[in-house]
Amino acid sequence: MRQILIAVGLALAVSILLTPVLIRLFTRQGFGHEIREDGPPTHHKKRGTPSMGGVAILAGIWVSYLGTHLVGLALDGEGPSASGLLVLGLATALGIVGFIDDLIKIRRARNLGLNKTAKTVGILAAALLFGVLALQFGNADGLTPGSPELSYVREIATVTLAPMIFVLFCVVLVSAWSNAVNFTDGLDGLAAGAMAMVCAAYVLITFWQYRNACATSPGLGCYNVRDPLDLALVAAAAAGACIGFLWWNAAPAKIFMGDTGSLALGGIIAGLSVTSRTEILAVVLGALFVAEVTSVVVQILAFRTTGRRVFRMAPFHHHFELVGWAETTVIIRFWLLTAIACGLGVALFYGEWLTAVGA
């Protein structure tokens, strides 16, 4: 628990202190955000706001993760794990794709960065590598970071995926989550605040898995997760970094995370869900992100098949703006819905454990 608190504190400190430095630097360099022309009229005043703030989030996560482990090693703790490094590696790779996308948008002074093919290839490459490596690095108990068995809050023994299918499943998860967070990042602080809550929920889940790991506490309800404590540190670092960034990203935002941050944070959710064996539960925890990306898919399908739109604009947070909700109202209400979803997800996780132990 001490390491988790250190991870949150370090990430928050780095993020909240580095972000204003980036604001000044990016402002001097003219790294301003471009606004989509067909977006809500109230958003045009945001044109020129510095972007690529995801650099501060990733920096906060990495400094926190490595710093916490240095402290842990001094206190006879363990070093970084395969699971933790895989999740952070995935997030960083996606963050690099997002950074290139953001940079191209800025250079071209328009809201169009990497073309769809290049961006998709970058995301798929990161996802494929993650999926392949997730089934490597078996520990003394034979546990690998990922499991070919589909998972709800633990592995579903009746649904086992072939290695190749598992890798493809990881590709779908990574692509879906990275795009989901990316679509959600359209209002000041919305994605950062929601991510902080989802990551906080994952801290509780992975720490509980650590306290009830089959390797140390065999018995009813134990969890076969390779590195649960290290995953808790990753989740704690991500939560702290998002909170620190939110200080500057809250409405009216002084900086945006850009694709650098949104793609990386989508990778955090995808990576944590695979390595903690909670791929299905993650849909509940990240219900806001799921709803946002679903609204885009529904809008596209409806328009292509009927020629009509379901929402005034997608993602659907813009729909609520266009029907008269103030931006801050949308943000706060969506945060509340995220808090409810996270609470429900944690309750489902704990309820399954109670059932497993026969309580």
UniProtKB/Swiss-Prot annotation:
Species name: Mycobacterium sp. (strain KMS)
Cofactor: Mg(2+)
One GO CC annotation: plasma membrane
Lineage, highest ranks first: Bacteria, Bacillati, Actinomycetota, Actinomycetes, Mycobacteriales
Gene Ontology biological-process entries: cell division; cell wall organization; peptidoglycan biosynthetic process; regulation of cell shape
UniProt protein name: Phospho-N-acetylmuramoyl-pentapeptide-transferase
Topology relative to the membrane: Multi-pass membrane protein
Enzyme class, broadest EC rank: transferase
InterPro entries in the cross-refs: Glycosyl_transferase_4, PNAcMuramoyl-5peptid_Trfase, PNAcMuramoyl-5peptid_Trfase_CS
Catalytic activity: UDP-N-acetyl-alpha-D-muramoyl-L-alanyl-gamma-D-glutamyl-meso-2,6-diaminopimeloyl-D-alanyl-D-alanine + di-trans,octa-cis-undecaprenyl phosphate = di-trans,octa-cis-undecaprenyl diphospho-N-acetyl-alpha-D-muramoyl-L-alanyl-D-glutamyl-meso-2,6-diaminopimeloyl-D-alanyl-D-alanine + UMP
